[in-house]
Amino acid sequence: MVPPLALDIDGTLTTASGRLDARVFELLPDWDAPVVLATGKAFPYPVALAHFLGRAETVIAENGGVVHVDGETAILGDAEAPRAVVEAFRERGGDPGWGARDTVNRWRETEVALSLDADEALLREVAAAAGGDVEVVDTGYAYHVKSTGVSKGRGLERVGDALGIGPDEFVAIGDSENDVSTFAVAGESYAVANADGAAREAADIVVADSYMDGTAGVLADLRTRTE
């Protein structure tokens, strides 16, 4: 039997141009074990993807700030401190980088994401001045200002508890520093070749191929193992 999966989305299920790879719709709908979509994106994104895959809405959103499993949603992060940091960042001349119509954060409940064009040094300075309750995570796609201690890994532990599956039974695939906590609790972890240094160091295996090419290869190997 194939193992349950914990899958990042951006950089893992996508192409180099950021588009969702069509193979997602070939490989995941019939995966005969739970599939957890674990992302830094706002809650509606992984829910929508699960819906279009025809799978249960088992998701970890906002880097662990929101977890949805078995029809229950848990808010594990607190947006108050991250929003205060971003407001202070603005007051010091910083620009989050999304323009007036910020759909990146429109539905975000527990953190704030800023464009990679934002002033990272200033953002980290402001976040550090706020104390230890807030941290900045660079996913390679955005800077996420989030509650310290909230992580995808803790989200996966919560999902596992709800499903009666130990986190060490999951196979995790990802590409970024926000996947390190998932790799730490999963039984087996893979970084795709485009992964950043933190993810590569934390993963059990760094595969040769990038983006969905790498993920598809891992899934094929997992299927072969169970035949």
Swiss-Prot record:
A GO cellular-component term linked to this record: cytosol
Cofactor: Mg(2+)
InterPro entries, sorted: HAD-like_sf, HAD-SF_hydro_IIB, HAD_sf, PGPase
Top-rank EC class of the record's enzyme: hydrolase
Catalytic activity field: 2-phosphoglycolate + H2O = glycolate + phosphate
UniProt keyword terms in alphabetical order: Carbohydrate metabolism, Hydrolase, Magnesium, Metal-binding
Chain residues that bind Mg(2+): 8, 10, 175, 179
Enzyme Commission number(s): 3.1.3.18
Molecular function per GO: magnesium ion binding; phosphoglycolate phosphatase activity
Residues noted as binding substrate in the record, renumbered to the chain: 152
Stored Gene3D superfamilies: 3.90.1070.10, HAD superfamily/HAD-like (3.40.50.1000)
Active site: residue positions: 8 (nucleophile)
This protein's record includes keyword Transferase: no
HAMAP family (UniProt xref): GPH_hydrolase_arch
Function noted in UniProt: Catalyzes the dephosphorylation of 2-phosphoglycolate.
UniProt-recorded name of the protein: Phosphoglycolate phosphatase
